[in-house]
């Protein structure tokens, strides 16, 4: 792709990286999430990352402003915000108004992104279905449950 054509589509290389994450990793799971197929969505995310592991392990090394970690967290946040907004339809949480869709989307985006980054950092040696099991465990157990199990 020549430079002029590139800049007709993307602002910079970081914009391109966000596009790749959205298109290759998150778009394929959108339909699964909308149909409450959460485990299948997790396995697909980790499988697609692993399929292009060399690319994502290099991208992981991008640090500082516009780091890969920041880009992926924002992409996950955008997807979750959309999904939460569809279900909540603008209504505040009945018991905790502070829990806005934005707050919940950011919390879960950071959580998911942490697991993704640790998995990439560790060389993606754990199988996608096992990483999905780990994430499901973390999400279904409170901090207090986990402390009691130690």
What positions do the PLM features span?
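Alpha-helical bundle regulatory/interaction domains
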Residues: 1-150
């Amino acid at each position: 792709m020549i430079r002029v054509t590139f800049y007709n589509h993307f602002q910079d290389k970081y914009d391109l990286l966000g596009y790749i994450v959205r298109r290759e990793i998150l778009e394929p799971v959108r339909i699964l999430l909308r149909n409450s197929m959460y485990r299948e969505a997790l396995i697909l995310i980790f499988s697609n990352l692993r399929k292009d592991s060399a690319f994502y392990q290099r991208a992981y090394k991008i640090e500082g402003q516009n780091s890969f970690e920041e880009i992926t967290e924002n992409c996950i946040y955008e997807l979750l915000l959309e999904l939460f907004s569809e279900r909540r339809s603008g209504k505040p949480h009945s018991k905790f108004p502070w829990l806005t869709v934005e707050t919940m989307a950011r919390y879960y985006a950071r959580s998911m992104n942490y697991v993704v980054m640790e998995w990439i950092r560790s060389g993606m040696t754990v199988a996608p279905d096992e990483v999905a099991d780990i994430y499901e465990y973390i999400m279904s157990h409170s901090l207090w449950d986990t402390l009691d199990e130690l």
